[in-house]
Amino acid sequence: MDGIGDGTESMGFDMPMLMNQQPHLFGSYGHDGSPVAPIFSNPTFQDEPSIGAADDNSDAKRRRIARACDMCRKKKIKCDGKMPKCSHCTNYKTDCVFTQVEKKRNPPKGAKYIEGLENRLGRMESLLRLSGLLSEDDGGKTDLGTLEKRLADRYHASGSNTPHNPQKINIPSQSQIAMSQQNSSSHYSTPRLESQSSPRTAATSPESQKESETEVEGLSDMMCSLVTNNCGETRYIGSSSGFSIFSPKGIQWVNEKTGDNSFQEMISSAYVDDNKWMYWKPEIFSDIFARRVFKPLPPKDEAMSLFKDFFDNFNCMFPLYHEPTFMHLVERQYSRDPYEGSGWWASINVVLAIAHRLRVMSNLVPQEEDRKAWLYLKNAMGVLTELTMRNTDLLSVQALLGMSLFLQGTPNPQPSFFLVAAAIRLSHSIGLHKRGSGFGLNPVEVEQRKRVFWIAYLLDKDICLRSGRPPVQDDDDMNVELPSDDPPDNIGNVPLSDGRSKFNLFRSMCRFATIESKVYKRLYSAKASKQSDGELLNTIGELDKELEDWKDSIPLDFRPEHEIKASHTPLILHVVVLHFAYYNCLTTIHRMSVHHGYWTSRLSNYAIQGLNARPLNPRVFLSAVLCVTAARASINLIKYIPQGDFACVWLILYYPVSALVTLFANILQNPSDARARSDVKLMNVVVNFLSTLVSDESNGSIKRMLGLCGEFERIAKVVLDKAEKESYSKKKRKSPEEPVNLQQSTPEEHPAPSPSTTQPTQAPSRNVPMSSPLFAENPGDPGGNTMADDAGGFASSREIPGTTGVSTNIPPNIQAMPGIAQDYQDMLSPDPLEGVSFADQPPYSATANTPLSSFQQPFVPQDLWQMPMTIEWDWADMSTNFPVFDTNGPPHGGL
């Protein structure tokens, strides 16, 4: 111990006690986090008696201490701390006792954050030293500008074809960094491709990051293989497969190791004669794979006319086939050497079926011509087993998608579900979901593969959102770019009203499908159900913003919430379906907020108290109003549907029927809504639309759907009549001499909301009515324009002469949130929907005789959203007996 004391005194207290001890990041704190004075940086040696006795000239005076002795402390006098007794204890002959009181203090706020920053900086400096950008003895002398210059020089040097400088060391991978930290004397240099997967430091420029990502994706493509045989069929093998050695990168590696191309030549020759499963189990499957012809192909002239109709009116918007390639195979089909592939046989029959249906839809031929379409589809369905069990070519994928598109116009949705799933699975077999930069395809092939994949993708996501079933394609495992915005063949482009501009509608539909996919994945998947309140609200706001950005990118001629400016019937149908899908997606996003009952005190407290980490999209507070408005707009689109087109009706019937359910729910919850009567008229529009479709006795599904929708309309009328009677009875019970005016209300009865109150304003819910109205025509006038209902706690607005439309008063809980009130007011204005005309709807204005509900925004109850919202085409499985209407229409009248 004496040696230790002597060593300590000779070194002084400015030196560390242990030479092999790592330097502390925080010199003012002990190992347990408690603060320690600098002189007591190592308390082990400070209580050592030899330290105090080491100096012979010392007067035996104690070291300076933090506490006085107990007696001096009690008398509140200065203690000199002499040994063995202080002066006062010696004079008064008392015991000099020092009671050690351990005093712990927590580290100051932010200590752990600073510690984390220092740790990260230390690791970053270590990485820079390992990369050669910093020298070992730099000591923090290199400034940031010098580092950036060195990094730029290193980046340009690595991008050139010159050999690497052996003195410069590439940034190692994580495992090598860990090894180098354990053994600082060794350095590891890695190949260039390996260094691309290393963690990027803060000094990496955005350009180098983008370049690295591109090279990594290129390497991933090289690890995939697309093998084509002499029949034109392909087989895709992904990088995760154990057979990825047959990929271009794997073959290149084998060639480099062996020094010759024998392996590559053997693989190529093996695949040339590969017919895969053409002759698999012929004794069992020969009769199944036999091709049955239910209707022979038409003569060439008639077929050419049908093909022209298909490519001019359908394929121009849904580019399922490449026209030059298809017509080449058509010429071969009507020659002496037709192509015998089952994928081509199914494709030509599907095109004929769709072409016949287009003619029937445009009223160019009688309705009986639709039977020909079904017979050609039957030809294609005859080889369905062969398409799914044998084939792996693009024509087979196209044929499956064509069948699915045809069958979407039928009451039974199950075939479309199955065919789309089979098409996507088959597209994986030929690598359509991958960019294919290393497949050696020409630009025309690449573009057509992209188009076919995106058609399958948008069908998959549309089915997913409407049926609530998970999608087939995983968004995390695809890297196909969107179709070209302005392709050379002009596919997908539609002219605008100005006569000069054009817009690619197909690409916009593909972008919309990606939003639909995000809506399901982030709001309705099993993983999404585990989100917190804040995460869910932010997700709703982000998805709503993305959807609105997409809508704003569409020209006004075709933009939702505006009148459709198109004269070509097939084009109108495409645009109408897109508008229906937009309103359905908007409702699906905001239905999650209503579904969870977020217009309750829980949401109000959460939002007003600022518990969300990011500012919320103000439209999340209008979820119910947006759902109901979208339902009204959807029903208004019925006027664009061609009359008598059953295929088209089944394609879009889901949307108006689900909109009717939304309006029905809103009327049940809000019977005193100012637009309730006009909403009943809109429900009647749907009922009358369905009643025009029951002329065909075979359409039992239409009758069941009509019966249910007619019952919804009847119940809504009963609820409205009851609400009006109750309102009239309340007003009749009031004394006419007793004016009701808010000016007579005392501040105690109606306290003004204040953002500074400790208890936030109670948000409205189904059971908690607000004492102040949402809509008032004059927000600045505290009296005269608003009437309070003393009995029920509801409030109503009085109409100001000359004003119509949505009133713009802001609820207190929104007004208390800075920056949101104006956005809220703007969204309540009718301008965003001025282009949407609602048939037979009066202006939205509240009168003194119309009592408004609590919070007055349409509120769809949670209970009804718990209904199965997958009102699909076929209701044949519903066990409840609904009333069946005859062909004369429902009791409410017809169109």
Curated annotation (Swiss-Prot):
Highest taxon, organism lineage: Eukaryota
SMART domains in alphabetical order: Fungal_trans, GAL4
Membrane topology: Single-pass membrane protein
DNA-binding residues (ranges): 69-96
UniProt key word Transport: no
Low complexity: bias regions: 755-765
Segments crossing the lipid bilayer: 648-668
Gene Ontology molecular functions: DNA-binding transcription factor activity, RNA polymerase II-specific; sequence-specific DNA binding; zinc ion binding
Subcellular locations according to the entry: Nucleus; Membrane
InterPro entries for this protein: AtrR-like, Transcription_factor_dom_fun, Zn2-C6_fun-type_DNA-bd_sf, Zn2Cys6_DnaBD
GO biological process, one term: DNA-templated transcription
Composition-biased stretches (Polar residues): 158-207
Function: Transcription factor that regulates expression of the genes related to ergosterol biosynthesis, including erg3B, erg24A, erg25A, as well as cyp51A that encodes a target protein of azoles. In coordination with ffmA and ncaA, is responsible for the expression of the ABC transporter abcC/cdr1B/abcG1 related to azole resistance. Directly binds both the cyp51A and abcC/cdr1B/abcG1 promoters at a conserved 34 bp region called the atrR response element (ATRE).
Subunit architecture: Interacts with ncaA.
Protein name, as recorded: ABC-transporter-regulating transcription factor
